[in-house]
A protein has these predicted regions:
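An alpha-helical support segment within catalytic cores of ATP-dependent transferases
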Residues: 299-317, 417-473, 484-485, 577, ...
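ATP/Mg2+ or Mg2+-diphosphate-binding catalytic cores
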Residues: 289, 296-297, 553-594
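N-terminal nucleotide-binding beta1-loop-alpha1 segment
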Residues: 53-86
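ATP-binding pocket architecture of kinase catalytic cores
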Residues: 319-426, 440-448
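Conserved NTP-binding catalytic cores of kinases and kinase-like/nucleotidyltransferase enzymes
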Residues: 265-372, 459, 463-464, 469, ...
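Conserved core of the sugar-phosphate nucleotidyltransferase
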Residues: 172-248
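Conserved beta-loop-beta/alpha segment of the NTase-like Rossmann-fold superfamily
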Residues: 127-198
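Active-site activation/catalytic loop segments of kinase-like enzymes and analogous catalytic loops
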Residues: 502-531, 544-562, 581
């Protein structure tokens, strides 16, 4: 039986609080006393209450509005909360003395909701204890690293009915959960002035009719969501229909809702400001809990304090920087300036010699190429550097800047600096191949044929007898920074080692996505003259080997659950094009364009 909102609210209060007065119902629901009186008459006429209490028919009617379960989404990295989220999931942080997800579970249990599922992914093992402590169910989202949270909803779609959808890191100052809910809703709070949040427009009965990202003086989405069975039954087929589309991978579950908003009935549940907190940054949580940082058990912040000699309370303006393919980095400031904390990415300990990187950083500092470097822990892989305000990356399409980059390469190569470690694209590629095989047989079409070509190119290049010197080996535009004074820095020396001088050119061409004309021009800048055919051939051998090496590296990262994206295809294409071409140049001993 379908109940009007007023009838539902009145019947619910009568069921939960036997003997409750109409005045108390009005206070609890926000309905006027007259509306409560009208609802009492309506419920009596429908035989849903008898003598001011719910009848058996009334309790049966209320049952279809009973909340069945709750889903807590806890799979994501929460990159905006870096660097704390590098160490543990955001939902496990302690705010005002309580662990966020535990507080939320306790609020659900207090509302009589005992069927609780936690969807995990990033650092999933940190959540397993919740099964024993609270009796929750754990569901692992295997796609958390490559897809947005619509994948978490997909993992539990068969559990959706009358269901709360929650985020593990929300903090509710009052318990928002209820045993009975009238209709699907999204919690909203009011923002005075401009906001970047998702702002809602509503129609009759507060149904959400449209949503815009950003607005002013608007109600915006925040906190818990409730799917009633009608919403769940309509939403799941819509999600299934688009799930396998590549465009869906980056979509939040809300995007699928918005794409179908005319067909999905969801209302806005309005809350007073200060009821729901999501803490999008460290500074936000510190405003709410001034002692948060002091009470935080964080190796990252301990590292910062120990290296810089600052107080933990000084650390501020913490926010993530654009993440690299191998590491996670964040900005922070103290009273002494701005800095970058680099946290090693998952699996990098098997790929990178951090002792060599630390030694190379010191050499780069001494050469005046990277004086941002402050400290690196060679055992753990974390690093602290100075932050360069208003910095920009080198433009690989700007000939003058390319010339400067090539002069930096020549400076490094011609220095007497040396490392104990070596770097070789072919050896590295074979190392990555071994790591890849740990995930099972390599059944990528054409893989073995490409690996055989790489071996032949390596043999030809070695026979050239080219100089071995200190090389950067991740030498491309994103690792070049220009400051406000046009000073050029070459950063991130984690792949550095003693190698064939052409290694840096190979990386540059591949990772800057140079065409052949641009590559040849860069080579002219490197030699400060037109290169010989033999020099062209040798350097392009390293373009081929760099492409192949990073292609195999990408396959490893994808196998580990990381999302490399288009770079995998870029690396593959350079390997495919130049492995065959360079072999032809060696076999035929002349250069051919195209």
């Amino acid at each position: 039986m379908t109940l009007s909102k007023n009838d539902f609210l009145t019947l619910r209060e009568l069921a939960l609080h036997p003997g409750i007065s109409q005045r108390s119902i009005s206070d609890a629901t926000g309905l006027s006393l007259g509306s409560v009186n009208s609802a009492m008459k309506s419920l009596t006429n429908c035989n849903l209450i008898e003598g001011g209490a719910p009848s058996s028919e009334g309790l049966a009617a209320l049952e279809s509005y009973r909340v069945e379960n709750a889903i807590i989404l806890a799979a994501g990295l929460s990159s905006r909360f870096a660097p704390i989220s590098y160490e543990k999931p955001k939902g496990l942080l302690k705010v005002r003395g309580e662990i966020l997800i535990e507080r939320q579970i306790e609020q659900l249990l207090a509302a009589g909701i005992t069927d609780i599922t936690v969807v995990v992914g990033y650092k999933k093992e940190y959540f397993f204890y919740l099964e024993d402590k609270f009796g929750v169910s754990i569901v692992v989202n295997p796609d958390y690293a490559s897809r947005n949270n619509s994948s978490s909803i997909k993992c539990v779609e068969e559990r959706l009915g009358n269901t709360y959808i929650c985020s593990s890191d929300d903090y509710f100052t009052v318990n928002p959960f209820e045993q009975y809910v009238w209709k699907a809703y999204y919690a909203v709070e009011y923002a005075e002035g401009p906001t970047n949040e998702w702002c809602v427009e509503t129609g009759t009965h507060d149904r959400i009719t449209s949503v815009t990202i950003g607005g002013s003086d608007s109600w915006y989405m925040i906190g818990q969501v409730y799917f009633d069975r009608a919403f769940s039954d309509a939403y799941v087929p819509l999600l299934d229909a688009v799930y396998d589309s590549p465009a869906t991978a980056d979509k939040l579950w809300e995007h699928i809702y918005l794409d179908n908003i005319k067909h999905l009935d969801m209302t806005a549940r309005r809350y007073p400001a200060g009821t729901i907190f999501e803490f999008d940054s460290l500074d936000e949580v510190r405003q709410f809990d001034p002692m948060f940082l002091e009470n935080l058990d964080s190796e990252v912040f301990d590292n910062i304090v120990n290296v810089l000699g600052c107080e933990k309370s000084e650390i501020r303006d913490v926010y993530p920087l654009k993440q690299g393919l191998t590491n996670l980095s964040c900005h922070f400031a103290t009273n002494e300036g701005e800095f970058v904390y680099r946290h090693p990415g998952i699996g990098t300990e098997a790929m990178i010699d951090r002792t060599s990187e630390a030694a190379a950083q010191r050499i780069a500092y001494e050469l005046g190429i990277d004086d941002t470097f402050i400290f690196e822990d060679a055992d753990r892989g974390w690093k602290i550097s100075r932050f360069i305000p208003q910095a920009r990356n080198l433009d690989p399409r700007n000939d003058a800047e390319v010339a400067r980059a090539m002069k930096v390469a020549r400076l490094v190569h011609d220095s007497d600096a040396a490392l104990a470690s070596t770097f070789d694209f072919y050896t590295e590629g074979k190392h990555y191949e071994k790591l890849l095989l740990e995930h099972g047989p390599i059944d990528v079409p054409g893989y073995q044929e490409m690996a055989d070509l790489a071996r032949r190119v390596k043999e030809y290049a070695d026979a050239d007898g080219a100089p071995v010197c200190l090389t950067h080996n991740d030498f491309f535009y994103l690792n070049f920074l220009l400051d406000e004074n046009d000073h050029l820095y070459l950063i991130d020396w984690e792949y550095s080692g003693m190698a064939d001088y052409a290694s840096d050119f190979g990386t540059y061409v591949v990772c800057c996505e140079c065409d052949e004309k641009e590559a040849l021009r860069a080579l002219e800048h490197y030699f400060d003259r037109k290169p010989t055919f033999e020099e062209v051939r040798h350097n392009f051998a390293y373009v081929a080997l760099a492409g192949w090496c990073w292609y195999v590296w990408s396959l490893v990262k994808e196998a580990e659950g990381d999302f490399v994206g288009e770079w995998l295809y870029i690396y593959y294409n350079y390997a495919k094009k130049y492995l065959s071409k360079v072999i032809r140049w060696y076999d035929e001993s002349f250069y051919t364009e195209g």
